[in-house]
């Protein structure tokens, strides 16, 4: 299959370029805010809509700064240390989910400490929202023709213009499906059907567990970053960074269901 060559820049106004990647962040945050409000309306937890509104600024800063610094420090430090100005070129892509997650967690912790909100109760409301941004971000990765998969002989293998013109797994779409749609469905079912907000930390644990599991599995089909390659001969950076998430998620689930 031939990659549908889509311009990663939607439009430009002078030096300002609006990319699909940037748009995915904006839409993801807006849809996430809307969905989190619906959860608050339904279950009326101690966290209020005003709390959520106040948190948006924290979230945006934490996600963008954390995501960018995570990519710079973990995936391509030599390039950015040689050309620091490139760190600001977020429209080219280059955001780390793990960095963004850590930035978001730190932002949530600081916010909860300031407003005296239970941290895990707050992240339990945020957890069902995150897959929305993950889905849109992976679609943007696909449009950019980046983070493609390994070479495959399968009929659905896709030739990406920035690769070696060999058919490859469209791993961005695999991630959009599992980390986005499937994980969203799991958390929505847990939240609305099984009332998991009643157990502090359970939603957060479900998110971390399934994200870690999905990411570790899909990395088998994803081409490792060329500047890093394989670690210990067979592992990717994404897999290594996802193991702590899987362990943390399992711990939170166990803690939310004490015997």
Curated annotation (Swiss-Prot):
Where does the chain cross the membrane?
Answer: 9-29, 55-75, 92-112, 117-137, 172-192, 201-221, 228-248
Q: Does the keyword Cell inner membrane apply?
A: yes
**Broadest EC class assigned to this enzyme:** transferase
Tell me where it mainly resides: membrane
Q: Where does a 1,2-diacyl-sn-glycero-3-phospho-(1'-sn-glycerol) bind?
A: 138
Regarding protein family, the annotation reads: Belongs to the Lgt family.
Protein name listed in UniProt: Phosphatidylglycerol--prolipoprotein diacylglyceryl transferase
Gene name, per UniProt, is: lgt
